[in-house]
């Protein structure tokens, strides 16, 4: 320290530069002895490329690599079991195959009270003959749809049950019983899907359904009026819209 006090500023700068170059040379030599030029604390923490200075690094980096890449697709094999969970609901809510209907009699019971359970249906129809299946239709949340399927081993037993219970009230609601055939099965599916959307006449929204019906009435009335069909464009107020657009355009031109 005493020597630097006697030296000039330029000499001190030159001395510092010479010391830095000497330290750099020593650092390179130590790196070669250790087996790596990029070892040290950086290699220990971040998993560097060092040799002897980063001996514990490969063991720490291996678990990180094993969690990604190859092992990631393994959890995606679990969704293959999801269809098995919904298989029971699909068979309960749907209808059987054609071969199953030919061997016995199948009844479709509708307009049921939502409190009627599977046990109630089985107890009600078991007195007419042996049953293959008697179950209420439920949605995925467990709520009753108000319909049920009753499978008899013999078609004659199904006809007896239909004649006996069709129109008879159960828990305050009259049962509607039909013998399921291929034609009834094909007709019931679109009716059920449309009834959930708010009716057959308006499956896609109320205003659109009424507009379509109104156009049909106008067409039938305009046939006897000759040129009455030309009045429909006036009801759309297209001229007023054009006038409004023209006024807006003129206003923009005036301001500019």
From Swiss-Prot:
Residues annotated as transmembrane: none
Protein's UniProt name: THO complex subunit 4-B
GO MF: C5-methylcytidine-containing RNA reader activity; mRNA binding
Keywords: Chaperone, Cytoplasm, mRNA processing, mRNA splicing, mRNA transport, Nucleus, RNA-binding, Transport
Residue stretches making up the RRM domain: 105-182
Residue numbers spanned by region Disordered: 15-85, 186-256
Biased segments, Gly residues type: 32-54, 196-212
Subunit and partners: Component of the transcription/export (TREX) complex; TREX seems to have a dynamic structure involving ATP-dependent remodeling.
Name of the coding gene: alyref-b
């Amino acid at each position: 320290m005493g020597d630097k006090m006697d030296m000039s500023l330029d000499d001190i700068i030159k001395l510092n530069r010479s010391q830095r170059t000497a330290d750099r040379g020593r650092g390179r030599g130590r790196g070669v002895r250790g087996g790596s030029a990029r070892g040290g604390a950086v290699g220990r923490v971040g998993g560097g490329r060092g040799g002897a200075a980063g001996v514990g690094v490969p063991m720490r980096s291996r678990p990180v690599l094993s969690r990604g890449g190859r092992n990631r697709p393994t959890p995606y094999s679990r969704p293959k079991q999801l269809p098995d969970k919904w298989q029971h609901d699909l068979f309960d809510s749907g209808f059987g195959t054609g071969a199953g209907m030919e061997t016995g009699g199948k009844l479709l019971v509708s307009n049921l009270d939502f409190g009627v359970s599977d046990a109630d249906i089985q107890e009600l129809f078991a007195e007419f003959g042996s049953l293959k299946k008697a179950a209420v239709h439920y949605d995925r949340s467990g709520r009753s749809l108000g319909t049920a399927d009753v499978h008899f081993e013999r078609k004659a037993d199904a006809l007896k049950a239909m004649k006996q219970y069709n129109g008879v009230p159960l828990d305050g609601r009259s049962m509607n019983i039909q013998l399921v055939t291929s034609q009834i099965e094909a007709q019931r599916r679109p009716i059920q899907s449309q009834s959930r959307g708010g009716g057959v006449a308006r499956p896609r929204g109320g205003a659109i359904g009424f507009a379509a019906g109104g156009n049909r009435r106008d067409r039938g009335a305009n046939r006897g009026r000759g040129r009455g069909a030309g009045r429909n464009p006036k009801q759309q107020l297209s001229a007023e819209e054009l006038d409004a657009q023209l006024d807006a355009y003129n206003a923009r031109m005036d301001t500019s």
